[in-house]
Amino acid sequence: MDDFERRRELRRQKREEMRLEAERIAYQRNDDDEEEAARERRRRARQERLRQKQEEESLGQVTDQVEVNAQNSVPDEEAKTTTTNTQVEGDDEAAFLERLARREERRQKRLQEALERQKEFDPTITDASLSLPSRRMQNDTAENETTEKEEKSESRQERYEIEETETVTKSYQKNDWRDAEENKKEDKEKEEEEEEKPKRGSIGENQVEVMVEEKTTESQEETVVMSLKNGQISSEEPKQEEEREQGSDEISHHEKMEEEDKERAEAERARLEAEERERIKAEQDKKIADERARIEAEEKAAAQERERREAEERERMREEEKRAAEERQRIKEEEKRAAEERQRIKEEEKRAAEERQRIKEEEKRAAEERQRARAEEEEKAKVEEQKRNKQLEEKKHAMQETKIKGEKVEQKIEGKWVNEKKAQEDKLQTAVLKKQGEEKGTKVQAKREKLQEDKPTFKKEEIKDEKIKKDKEPKEEVKSFMDRKKGFTEVKSQNGEFMTHKLKHTENTFSRPGGRASVDTKEAEGAPQVEAGKRLEELRRRRGETESEEFEKLKQKQQEAALELEELKKKREERRKVLEEEEQRRKQEEADRKLREEEEKRRLKEEIERRRAEAAEKRQKMPEDGLSDDKKPFKCFTPKGSSLKIEERAEFLNKSVQKSSGVKSTHQAAIVSKIDSRLEQYTSAIEGTKSAKPTKPAASDLPVPAEGVRNIKSMWEKGNVFSSPTAAGTPNKETAGLKVGVSSRINEWLTKTPDGNKSPAPKPSDLRPGDVSSKRNLWEKQSVDKVTSPTKV
């Protein structure tokens, strides 16, 4: 017993270790080397099982040896039989373990298939959800199934979780089976001890037939051994017969107990199967209920999601409209700024035109001023020329007179005196001429500066005028000198400079001192001319530099004005392009918005058409009664029982009533006659029943309670029209009193009884739109389908 307890404790510890290992594995799913770890664990489990098996076999052999040693009187034949039985039992145990392994493999396969079938209905089920008690129960129910030979296959172990579950399950089942077998073995040993059997045989685990045969053989051998040991060998036949009878009774007793065990096992198996079926059925019902609840929750979530999307779409449309309004406002502001910019450019152009006009007027005034100044200068020059000519003539006349007088005096005395006098007169004359030239130059310079201040753009003309004047002045001076000195010749160089006059020998012969005096006089006369030429050149150079600078400034201003104009043109072109792009983008956005609206309308129309088609198909699929039209009882049709013909009639009547409000009275009379013809068609159906009419939803053109219409619409959208009863809507005020005597009133109205409330067909002059609608309501509340179809809701 101590050895048995030790083995059981070892098995319990091993199960605990395997359970802990399985729990640890369940939390280590992210291991990089999962396959290697699983393979190593399986290898260790196989080694552990083999080791336990060898230990059990060795322990069984040791137990047998101890029992044999305890029986000192047993002969060698009994020892041989025991050894042979032990070997046979070991082979049987190996075969039995193999059969159990195959049976367990088949059971695991069936369990896996069942789990896969359950996964098809509920994906949330996993292999790890199978509890240990259910596994043990399935093990007990699967042990009695038919055995088939199949090879072990480890190729199925693809998923890590399935592999670990199978390993742990097999270990648990094998340990449970061993515990059960050991318990049975203990019970059998106790029974044998109670029956006073001296020897306990090694019984094969879970083999009922082999165990019975072995017990019979052992009991017979024990009887023989005991007789040999005590030396009481008797050859009496009655005693042997008693022993045989006792053995047969014992065998029958064992058989009876085995049958009872079998019956109890069958009953237990049947009970377990029934419980399993009940459990599976309950689980299936629970799954179906959960699935239904999940579907309803999903539908509810989908409806909420749809409402949310619609709200988001409405919000988005509002945002887009707001952005479009802001964009339009921005475009208006930009257009306003562009208009202001154009106005500013026009004003600038206007100012530029005024400036050009002012410049032209100033140029014109400057030209007139120059013309006037030129005329004045010409007049002054003429007056001065006349004065100079007169003075020169006077001087010439005086010189001629002096010359004539000097010829008459003696050459030496008179010549000297005349030369001195001439030199003095020449000096005086040159001083006077120099003074006059300086005064003229000062006047001309002042006029030139004044003209330059008035308008610097016309310097070239002034320069030409001054050149002409300067050219005239030296010529006049030279002429005066030539008139006075006939011996000088006028020489002008190509660059406009005046050279000193070369002297010619006169015919009259003077003395030597007289010749030197004439040379000094000529040099004194040429010096002022050279100085005047230098000053003239300096003035010309300065005037040219000033004119070139002013001309460059004017050219630079013109270029700047041209650049500014180009920039303005570029800005205007860019602004125009921006406006065109904005306009193009706005048009594109408008087109996109229209396309989206068209797409939304088309989608809604397709959805409505689809719902109409589905409703029509559902109405057509409904079973029709086999009764004829004459035998059919009157029945209140609701939207779930309406037909296409009645729907078409209701649409026709609605259209006719809508048209009747704007047409002539003759047309109204025709509508009334059509209503009468429709009423006659339903007379037979109305007369066939006496039952009260349940309230109906009103027609689409009549006052309809909003809640009833909303309920009907929601039922048609959800598809519950044919499964759930329709909610009774609030009755109209017009139909409040039409619940009992409606059919009799309609019959009286149709038969044109004189005491009816209203005439069936009044004249067109008496007809009013209210009469038509009220009469229509009378028969429409009792007709087959007076409400709008679900497609109109």
From Swiss-Prot:
Species in which this protein is naturally found: Homo sapiens (Human)
Biased segments, Basic and acidic residues type: 47-56, 108-122, 146-162, 173-188, 236-407, 435-458, 532-558, 566-633, 765-784
Gene Ontology terms describing biological process: actin filament bundle assembly; muscle contraction
Gene label: CALD1
Disordered: annotated segments: 26-94, 108-407, 434-458, 492-640, 687-706, 721-740, 747-793
Keyword vocabulary terms for this entry: Actin-binding, Calmodulin-binding, Cytoplasm, Cytoskeleton, Isopeptide bond, Muscle protein, Phosphoprotein, Repeat, Ubl conjugation
UniProt KW Calcium keyword: no
Subcellular location as annotated: Cytoplasm, Cytoskeleton; Cytoplasm, Myofibril; Cytoplasm, Cytoskeleton, Stress fiber
Name the UniProt record assigns to this protein: Caldesmon
Region (Weak actin-binding): 768-793
Known role: Actin- and myosin-binding protein implicated in the regulation of actomyosin interactions in smooth muscle and nonmuscle cells (could act as a bridge between myosin and actin filaments). Stimulates actin binding of tropomyosin which increases the stabilization of actin filament structure. In muscle tissues, inhibits the actomyosin ATPase by binding to F-actin. This inhibition is attenuated by calcium-calmodulin and is potentiated by tropomyosin. Interacts with actin, myosin, two molecules of tropomyosin and with calmodulin.
Ranges occupied by Sequence repeats: 319-332, 333-346, 347-360
Phylogenetic placement of the source organism: Eukaryota, Metazoa, Chordata, Craniata, Vertebrata
Chain segments annotated as transmembrane: none
